[in-house]
A protein has these predicted regions:
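Conserved short histidine dyad/triad with adjacent acidic residue
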Residues: 22, 37-52
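A short, N-terminal "cap"/entry segment at the start of jelly-roll beta-barrel domains
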Residues: 1-33, 48, 114, 118-147
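Short beta-strand His + acidic residue motifs that chelate non-heme Fe in jelly-roll/DSBH
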Residues: 48-49, 68-69, 85, 91-98
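Glycine- and acidic-residue-biased ligand/ion/polar-headgroup-sensing regions
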Residues: 54-66
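Short acidic-glycine-tyrosine-enriched beta hairpin
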Residues: 72-87
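A short hydrophobic beta-strand segment most commonly corresponding to one strand
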Residues: 38-39, 58, 84, 98-114
Length: 147
């Protein structure tokens, strides 16, 4: 039975600008199937919307506040809240708050397939209608705007 010391884990950048992750439990730590990853999201950073086609995922907010982008909806979540994303459902996260947020992603398998998605008519968490935000699309709008 391994004891995994958090301070001994290496952090990975690159999941998104302003986000880094560490695998807490996985194949390298001796897990038979479970995969748990801790992700830190800096202020004004986001985890792009994605789908796990064949695997559900539980995402637990350990620290901070952020917005969960679920399908076409944006919901504010904070410490202690859990998002359960069924297989095939679109989900992403946006930290438009002052401090960093820390999330645990819990998968029942090591083979986690993730596909980044764009949903027609859905935003990345910002109003996209010209006139409401002044921008044609969310990609045109700076992250720090509209708090």
């Amino acid at each position: 039975m391994p004891i995994i010391k958090k301070q001994e884990l290496s952090k990975r950048a690159g999941i998104a600008a302003g986000a880094e992750s560490s695998i807490l439990v996985g194949l390298d730590q001796g897990s038979q199937s479970l995969h748990i990853e801790e992700v830190s999201v800096a202020p004004n950073a986001r985890i792009p919307r994605r789908i796990n086609p064949h695997t559900e995922v539980a995402i637990i907010v350990q620290e901070g506040k952020l917005d969960a982008i679920l399908g076409r909806e944006r919901v504010a979540i904070g410490q202690g809240d859990t998002v359960l994303a069924p297989a095939g459902s679109a989900h992403g996260f946006l930290n438009r708050y002052e401090g960093p947020a820390r999330l645990l992603f819990i998968f029942p398998t090591h083979q986690v397939e993730q596909v980044e998605v764009s949903i027609p008519g859905a935003t990345l968490g910002f109003p996209s209608e010209k006139g409401l935000s002044g921008y044609q699309s969310p990609e045109d709008r700076p992250l720090g705007e509209g708090r």
